[in-house]
Amino acid sequence: MMDRLNCVCPDGEFLLIDKPLGWTSFDVVARIRTSYKKNGLKRKVGHCGTLDPLATGLLMLATGKKTKEISSIEILDKEYTGAIKLGVKTPSYDGETEEFDFCETSHLTSSEIHEAARQFLGKQQQKPPMFSATWHKGKRLYEHARQGKDIPERKSKDVEVFAFDITGIELPIVRFRLQVTKGTYVRSIANDFGERLGVGGYLTELRRTKIGDFSISQAETVSDILEKIVKTAEAHQANLT
């Protein structure tokens, strides 16, 4: 399955990549696109749903004719694993900004933590974080946030949480597995989870493990894909001589 998905086909393919920490989704697209061009292979390249720089895991790219199918991948449900630090908040709901509003967590019990997670299951309205790319009055929300502005009336959207499993508790860190609909901000869930427990919290680690039926176990590294592109170009050149 992995070889079929991650082959470098002339008409286009889906590339399943394990995105490294610190890379933007566009960084990955740019690296792949540049490699195609450098090796004399003309390919359109686009990603099938962004992944934050501070997250790792499954990023799907489409090339060639498969770029026409990007929208069919973007709508698929997602699965994540990660960690939340309780007893402290950040403006961005993750580690991108400074911690504030510290609070004791030693009084929290395992049953309270599991029950708080269960309360997130089902359909709900979710506000995007201020530090997000959502548009508001001609600007991205993060642009407003960096100017010190808060937009309480930012528009909520419908999301659904299918599973929110607590997989480990070592306070103040709580580890989890999450299954959600497309467009769900896991950072917002982390922040709201901390609020529900009365201590605050933010996302310290996030890894995307599934997009629909596509799994991180099928993914390859950026280096693996780049190597395949070079080999494909060499084989193509050999056929021409």
UniProtKB/Swiss-Prot annotation:
Q: What is catalyzed by this enzyme?
A: uridine(55) in tRNA = pseudouridine(55) in tRNA
Biological processes, Gene Ontology terms: mRNA pseudouridine synthesis; tRNA pseudouridine synthesis
Q: Which domain of life is it from?
A: Bacteria
What positions constitute the catalytic site? D52 (nucleophile)
InterPro entries in the record: PsdUridine_synth_cat_dom_sf, PsdUridine_synth_N, tRNA_psdUridine_synth_TruB, TruB_C
User: Which UniProt keywords are listed?
Assistant: Isomerase, tRNA processing
Q: Which residues form a coiled coil?
A: none
Give GO terms: molecular function aspect only: RNA binding; tRNA pseudouridine(55) synthase activity
The EC number on file is 5.4.99.25
Q: Show the PANTHER family listed in the entry.
A: PSEUDOURIDYLATE SYNTHASE TRUB1 (PTHR13767:SF2), TRNA-PSEUDOURIDINE SYNTHASE (PTHR13767)
Give the UniProt family note. Answer: Belongs to the pseudouridine synthase TruB family. Type 1 subfamily.
The role this protein plays is: Responsible for synthesis of pseudouridine from uracil-55 in the psi GC loop of transfer RNAs.
The name this protein goes by in its record: tRNA pseudouridine synthase B
According to its UniProt entry, this protein's organism is Chloroherpeton thalassium (strain ATCC 35110 / GB-78)
